[in-house]
Amino acid sequence: LFMGAHPDDIELGCGALLADIVGRTELYCMTFSDNKKNPDLQHLLDEHYVSMRTLGLRDDQIEVGSFETRRFPDFRQEILEKMLQLKRKLKPQIVFVHTAQDIHQDHVTLTQEALRAFRGTTVLGYDVLRSSYGFFPHFLVEVSEAGVNKKIEALSKYTTYAERYYFSEDVLRST
């Protein structure tokens, strides 16, 4: 189970890994915010689906919630309940979520609730460059060059964010 607060988080943090393991194991990706309240991001949800499909995921492996961006702390209980539903439905062996060193309020809430919801399950944190502070991983997962290239291709589908520094190929390749 891969969980991210916003469209692009999962791809930024785990895109190469997803590309490497898709088709070899059961996968499910849950993005908690659709960002629909921001008129500048009107195409973001479509870009997210295209990006995830580029990584090899099917639409039935992708779910997007409607929690409002920057308001996750206000909906902590509802987020926890959604995670408990996912736990019952999917029975994941491993959960990927934002690193505990992330400072974005939505990412912090998601990680804290994941640690509560998935007690007894391996929960691993991934880095999203633009919002983590002091990220010192306990271990790294090796990914293939093909996986990295697929991550870069997938993130190129986000025309909304094309000019942001963390979407440059050099930055994506190094993260």
Regions inferred by a protein language model and the residue ranges of each:
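Active-site beta-strand->loop->alpha-helix modules in alpha/beta enzyme cores, enriched
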Residues: 1-124, 130, 171
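The feature marks non-catalytic terminal segments
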Residues: 55, 59, 89, 94, ...
